[in-house]
Regions:
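N-terminal export leaders
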Residues: 3-9
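Early exported N-terminus immediately downstream of N-terminal targeting peptides
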Residues: 27-103
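Sec/Tat signal peptide C-region and signal peptidase I cleavage site
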Residues: 20-24
Length: 208
């Protein structure tokens, strides 16, 4: 099942984080936030730290600076309102775990990654869109646009746009389709997410 279309995009969505707090909602602050995360990303990916420690470091970064709950709720859409408390809790757990494993399962592929900020543009109440070029050894550069929100008083990544396509909107459509195929049950999505997480865990183990 295709819950995430691009491994690189899905992994990076939870990585470029944990910049020094920037209170000003400006393109410059957002660009500095993303640029600092490019440096932090390379340090972790290019290190010889054991895989489990790398994963934990990325998990800490993710929890501190991405609006995981906000993005997760957006992706689930109207189904968030109909989900039970237990389903919501399990969904949030699986959503975060999948973000982390999407990256850790690809640590080897991402080693040697190059990351450059090219511009930043205000997007009104949404925040600031920061454009970057990401290069992997032996592959053509990929343009990724990061939507940074300052609504909480500090920068938080709330979306990633690749080739004009919003990751959170794409995920929302895919998750909704899974629920529809499952008879409208959020539980059907949770089952699919567990399967995906298990596959990512196996892929991570194969790197060792």
């Amino acid at each position: 099942m295709r819950l995430h279309r691009r491994g690189l995009v899905a992994g990076l969505a939870g990585v470029l984080l944990l910049a020094p707090t920037a209170r000003a909602n400006t393109p410059e602050a957002a660009a500095a936030f993303i640029e600092s995360r490019g440096t932090a990303l390379k340090e972790v990916l290019d290190s010889d730290t054991p895989l489990a420690e790398k994963r934990e470091r990325m998990a800490e970064i993710l929890r501190e600076a991405v609006d995981v709950r906000g993005v997760a709720q957006f992706v689930l859409g109207r189904h968030w309102r109909t989900a039970s408390e237990a389903e919501r809790a399990e969904y949030l757990r699986l959503f975060e775990a999948t973000l982390i494993r999407n990256l850790s399962a690809r640590f080897g592929e991402l080693r040697g990654l190059r990351f450059t900020v090219s511009r930043s543009q205000p997007r009104g109440e949404e925040g600031v869109l920061v454009t970057t070029m990401v290069e992997q050894p032996g592959q053509a550069p990929v343009q990724l646009d990061w939507l940074v929100s300052f609504a909480s008083g500090r920068p938080l990544i709330v979306d990633l746009v690749a080739e004009g396509t919003s990751l959170r909107i794409t995920q929302r459509s895919e998750y909704s389709a899974v629920i529809q195929r499952g008879g409208g049950r959020v539980g059907a999505l949770l089952d699919a997410m567990r399967q995906q997480l298990s596959a990512l865990e196996q892929r991570e183990l194969a790197q060792k």
